[in-house]
Amino acid sequence: MKLNELRDNPGATKNRIRVGRGIGSGKGKTAGRGVKGQKSREGVSINGFEGGQMPIYRRLPKRGFNNPTRKSFAVVNLDRIQKAIDAKKLDATAVITEKALIEAGLVRRSQDGVRLLGKGELSVKVAIEVAGASATAREGVEKAGGTLTVTGAAAEAAPAAV
């Protein structure tokens, strides 16, 4: 078999139907749109219009609000940090900072920094410095003999919860 002999399997592709190309095609004249009326015209559909019936986006109540002070963290779990240490992408002897996590490819840069979550376990002693952390993440780091430093807005806002 050669590259120029490659073909799709029979029935794998369908030819598109060209409408409005004469009565012999079966899709000529009105091109499958029916006869007259708003829907037969060009540029017809008005998004959300339901023929005069109260549209669903007006029948349902408004909910929620956009919080202007919301924090947006990139999240990383303990098990991903451990895998990166095992793969020699992170140095366990140095302090693991947000910059180190980005360079290792564990997180992308985020607006308000990195938040550490507690899924998985650490098997080595590490020092981690992040913008936020869950209680289980703190337990996991301290259980392995490491230290966790929370910097940034999360530490100032709720030191008891972090």
Curated annotation (Swiss-Prot):
Task: Tell me the PROSITE patterns matching this sequence.
Answer: RIBOSOMAL_L15
Assigned GO CC terms: cytosolic large ribosomal subunit
- The segment annotated Disordered runs over 1-44
One annotated GO molecular function? structural constituent of ribosome
Keyword flag Hydrolase: no
Q: Which family does it belong to?
A: Belongs to the universal ribosomal protein uL15 family.
Assembly description: Part of the 50S ribosomal subunit.
PANTHER family tied to this protein: 50S RIBOSOMAL PROTEIN L15, LARGE RIBOSOMAL SUBUNIT PROTEIN UL15M
HAMAP family, per the entry: Ribosomal_uL15
* Protein name as catalogued: Large ribosomal subunit protein uL15
Protein species of origin: Rhodospirillum rubrum (strain ATCC 11170 / ATH 1.1.1 / DSM 467 / LMG 4362 / NCIMB 8255 / S1)
The primary gene name is: rplO
